[in-house]
Amino acid sequence: MANSERTNGLQETNQRYGPLQEQVPKVGNQAVGPIEIFRFADNLDIVLMTLGILASMINGATVPLMSLVLGEISDHLINGCLVQTNRTKYQNCSQTQEKLNEDIIVLTLYYIGIGAAALIFGYVQISFWVITAARQTTRIRKQFFHSILAQDISWFDGSDICELNTRMTGDINKLCDGIGDKIPLMFQNISGFSIGLVISLIKSWKLSLVVLSTSPLIMASSALCSRMIISLTSKELDAYSKAGAVAEEALSSIQTVTAFGAQEKEIQRYTQHLKDAKDAGIKRATASKLSLGAVYFFMNGAYGLAFWYGTSLIFGGEPGYTIGTILAVFFSVIHSSYCIGSVAPHLETFTVARGAAFNIFQVIDKKPNIDNFSTAGFVPECIEGNIEFKNVSFSYPSRPSAKVLKGLNLKIKAGETVALVGPSGSGKSTTVQLLQRLYDPEDGCITVDENDIRAQNVRHYREQIGVVRQEPVLFGTTIGNNIKFGREGVGEKEMEQAAREANAYDFIMAFPKKFNTLVGEKGAQMSGGQKQRIAIARALVRNPKILILDEATSALDTESESLVQTALEKASKGRTTIVVAHRLSTIRGADLIVTMKDGMVVEKGTHAELMAKQGLYYSLAMAQDIKKVDEQMESRTCSTAGNASYGSLCDVNSAKAPCTDQLEEAVHHQKTSLPEVSLLKIFKLSKSEWPFVVLGTLASALNGSVHPVFSIIFGKLVTMFEDKNKATLKQDAELYSMMLVVLGIVALVTYLMQGLFYGRAEENLAMRLRHSAFKAMLYQDMAWYDDKENNTGALTTTLAVDVAQIQGAATSRLGIVTQDVSNMSLSILISFIYGWEMTLLILSFAPVLAVTGMIQTAAMAGFANRDKQALKRAGKIATEAVENIRTVVSLTRERAFEQMYEETLQTQHRNALKRAHITGCCYAVSHAFVHFAHAAGFRFGAYLIQAGRMMPEGMFIVFTAIAYGAMAIGETLVWAPEYSKAKAGASHLFALLKNKPTINSCSQSGEKPDTCEGNLEFREVSFVYPCRPEVPVLQNMSLSIEKGKTVAFVGSSGCGKSTCVQLLQRFYDPMKGQVLLDGVDVKELNVQWLRSQTAIVSQEPVLFNCSIAENIAYGDNSRMVPLEEIKEVADAANIHSFIEGLPRKYNTLVGLRGVQLSGGQKQRLAIARALLRKPKILLLDEATSALDNESEKVVQQALDKARRGKTCLVVAHRLSTIQNADMIVVLQNGSIKEQGTHQELLRNGDTYFKLVAAH
């Protein structure tokens, strides 16, 4: 048997999925082209983008044109000043003070015209691009989700589903940032650079060429750093995707994580990927700032060279060179260099977006072999259900050399019920998957009514098939909607009828909200039996021509199993039904039983015929004692089996049900009324990184002083030409030129320091916040997870989006703001020193800018909150669909999920359109009023100079300083929306971190007894689930369990069996009464110690995306478990031989949720994991239900051996598995109806007797 198990298991795993190795996307310099990123723009988007670019280029020309006006004003003012102070020397000069006033007024009007252009085109460039970015991003989100849903199942076998969900949030957000308002700002700067360059060349090509001599160095350094940024960004995003995958896996399996005390292990897995992201992020930040610093260094060197050479030209007698010419060239070059520097952060955002787009577009461009949305193929008028497998051979795409099916030939007549049986790995599941056309055969064909299914329309064909799987999948909506997912356009009467046929109607109607009752995430609010019956109703409502049942009744309790089995048998009439069975007792009445082995049919016939042959089927049947079952069934009376007088064993209202309307409203209020978070509180988040933040802030402040100091040098340069001899002028030119070079060195060093210190601080903060948030999530109690707002999709979105918004605001954005504040403060101070009157006039425009900033900040904060909620809801829908893709595909409900996803995105899309206009208006006003302020300043400055109250030197210093200060204000306002988003994200993060769980799993308080014997007692326990306080689950239940005894809980679905187990694990605390362990209330015990004494094997085993050895070692997370010990428990669980037959043995990766393994293999790993824990209390919830016939007895024996000397609680539906229990407890209405041994209860002839008879 061991050899057979090893061979079959190896086939089931290797043949199906190939070598079990992790699918890790390769990382490199991967980014889409700068044009390709806009591939989802439609004609309107192209028009908007074109107009936006044109507007940004015109807007970019405003400052270079201003330099021309500045040059003219400079000549006029200098000449006017010379006329006024040297009247004797200039007595024959034609220029008079009146003429000067007229010229200044005309030039001021030019300034006002430039400001008006900036107002109009500034609004157009920003609003149009934000609009088109919102439109394209929404389209990309839809197309990305559509492409995922369109992929065939083989693609999902090789993809990390959790990473896909991370890309749907984090990567697309980065893409949106990169194609939004940063693009027109980049084009504005490019335009400013180009036009400034042209102006400088026209005014003085010699001087311009000297300045441009540094351009190759600038371009080379920028190109090198850009390549580094692309590569590092790709690595960073990849690491975050892997971290998101770990988080999603842990959060979606929180009960397993909590039960095994594995929170710290999951945190370590998560943190390891965060460390990789942090290392790449630090390098990326450093490279980005180094690039910016190099630009400023080379440009300042060019300025120094320009001034030195300019003075040489003037005093060398070159015609046409005046102070105005030099200033026009100089300011054009200055602005061009400023534009080059300003391009860098926007280019970085765009570069990051291109890297993110590569991953997104790669999925979008993937063409599936079987397109789930395809309209191709013919649609037959009707389907009878005649099925034939003609010489079908198949191997899974991931391992084409390993054949799973080898020339399978099988005919199934319409209306027949055919059962597929055989050991694990024989190809049963593969056969039904091929029939659903989840895969296509390599050789041969499958026909339905003599038509190759590949020639039929895939959606129409799948709509003719109903599937009920062993592990039912429900979606996080109402019971009614879950049933209606079975078929499009289902009416209320059809839904109710399907529920009746599935024996689900009564318990549904017992809920206060009936069919409108929410089932919770993954059906968490329903018991296993309730979930299965809803899934059966969903299949029946399809009215399928072909019905596939994969152990469809395995999760049902004893009372309803026979009723549902009867309903299924009735539903099978007139339909072709294929049953994949482990429990042969459920398929004795099949028209045809097909026994498979090694991908081929070895025998077929009726039950009686195959038993008579005494072949493989006979061996399987004998392993289950089916003969004994036959004899028992013959001795039972039909009246007992059919008697429904005993009714329901419990009020279904006691099932774990969703929250009431009032509670939902309270939860909604709580979510939408989060406290306001101040910027100071956000900054305090980075206090752990204070040395880096302080050094980075000092570097930013020093960097911010570069421009104000430059304004002083500039003013001195103007006065340098007033009545000075050549020798003095040459000395001054050399001095100021060297000072400009020094300023360039300061800029280089300070930018590099910002990258080093802020980069480290930002990535450390991001890692710490993600770590803290993930830890806070993992240590919440189960009641917190019952809240529908805390679903997996919403929580992973919080980790991916909120932290990203906070991290920059508290560190690198702080550096930019500090730099701008330093620039602005010093500029204003210098301006007051050199011309307080002119400064006051210009600053009178500041309130307009301040009000504009406040309006923008307030509006952005509101939009950020609404966007977050909308994206959370969208993330939940996407996560649910992708995680349960087989169910979605089988139900052909891809379009339904796509529609729900698109509807959710509409809120965010509408917000983006409103935000576009507000952002555009605020930017345009702030940008235009700078020009208006300049116009007023120059006119007033000319007046002050004429009045003798100010010198040209002071006016130019004030003008330059205020100009740089205004640019700093504008740059600060650009980042205002980022702070609004950060405040919104921080409010949610703080709420999470402050939420203290009622049951603190990480608490060190509580007793830790030296020994645990295992005596249990439920003393007058009453319990209601916190989210539904009006529905009692347990009512004054009292029960004593002696150490070492095996006690089984039986009863119908929802009567409190699982609740008892959860209370014992202290997932919840009773409302009244006590749960005692060795006479001590479990509330008094240390919760970690308590859970370390228990181990659970659930009906639906949860495995993690790591190796087999790591999954088994998950049973004991307090130590490093030796491999030998792992092998021992694997052998005890009858899984060791199978593992040893795998190429990588215990290092084999099991895939996401154990997808690389069969159900039986997963269950045996879960049993091994529980055995490793060496618990004093063993909790078994139908632990052998997923096992095939061949190994069920062996594993049951292993469990019988494992529970010796342990207190064992068994939650049972199949009564045959608990007949040897020391005590059987029958629950009804949340209390004990009767208890005793199997024989005692049979003699009583009460409820248990009737259950056995019905079974």
UniProtKB/Swiss-Prot annotation:
Keywords carried by this UniProt record: ATP-binding, Cell membrane, Differentiation, Glycoprotein, Membrane, Nucleotide-binding, Repeat, Translocase, Transmembrane, Transmembrane helix, Transport
Subcellular location: Cell membrane
Predominant location: membrane
Gene Ontology process terms (BP): cell differentiation; eye development; regulation of membrane potential
Expression across tissues: In developing eye, expressed in basal limbal epithelium but not in central cornea. Acts as a marker of limbal stem cells.
Any single Gene Ontology cellular-component annotation: plasma membrane
EC number(s) on file: 7.6.2.2
Listed PROSITE patterns: ABC_TM1F, ABC_TRANSPORTER_1, ABC_TRANSPORTER_2
Task performed by this protein: Energy-dependent efflux transporter responsible for decreased drug accumulation in multidrug-resistant cells. Specifically present in limbal stem cells, where it plays a key role in corneal development and repair.
Protein name: ATP-binding cassette sub-family B member 5
Record organism: Mus musculus
